[in-house]
Amino acid sequence: MTQDYKLQVEAIKCGTVIDHIPAQIGFKLLSLFKLTATDQRITIGLNLPSKRSGRKDLIKIENTFLTEQQANQLAMYAPDATVNRIDNYEVVKKLTLSLPEHIDGVLTCPNSNCISHNEPVDSSFKVKAKQGEIHLKCKYCEKEFDHQVVLQAD
């Protein structure tokens, strides 16, 4: 295969590529979704050129595959991202993300009085889309927050 361009982030033989992440969000996704909890090699591209959005972030995780549920949780902060499954340097499956109905054990409730801060329970939020905005409702305190507020709470 001849190419007239050079990859800015090295190709992987087998694993997951999360592409079209909004610029400045890649590191947050790595920590929020515990994508670094692996011994496998992770390659990160930040502020890469993008025809679609000007700039983007990119994450490649070797020998690791995200489930569709895990991938859809990324849609909260990277709604236009794609998750590609790579095998032998080829894309064998491409997931287009959609918002999940709920997200569990990932985010922290911004309400400091919520029991999820003091009790041994995993956080749990119902995902609601209202007039183009994403809101999260905590299962425990039942307060509703703009998803950006929850992102900043972590």
Curated annotation (Swiss-Prot):
Bound cofactor: record note: Binds 1 zinc ion per subunit.
Pfam families on file: PyrI, PyrI_C
Residues that bind Zn(2+): 109, 114, 138, 141
Cellular component terms (Gene Ontology): aspartate carbamoyltransferase complex
Gene Ontology biological process: 'de novo' pyrimidine nucleobase biosynthetic process; pyrimidine nucleotide biosynthetic process
Keywords noted in UniProt: Metal-binding, Pyrimidine biosynthesis, Zinc
Essential cofactor(s): Zn(2+)
One annotated GO molecular function: metal ion binding
Function: Involved in allosteric regulation of aspartate carbamoyltransferase.
Family to which the UniProt record says this protein belongs: Belongs to the PyrI family.
Assembly information from the UniProt record: Contains catalytic and regulatory chains.
Annotated protein name in UniProt: Aspartate carbamoyltransferase regulatory chain
Lineage, broadest ranks: Bacteria, Pseudomonadati, Pseudomonadota, Gammaproteobacteria, Enterobacterales
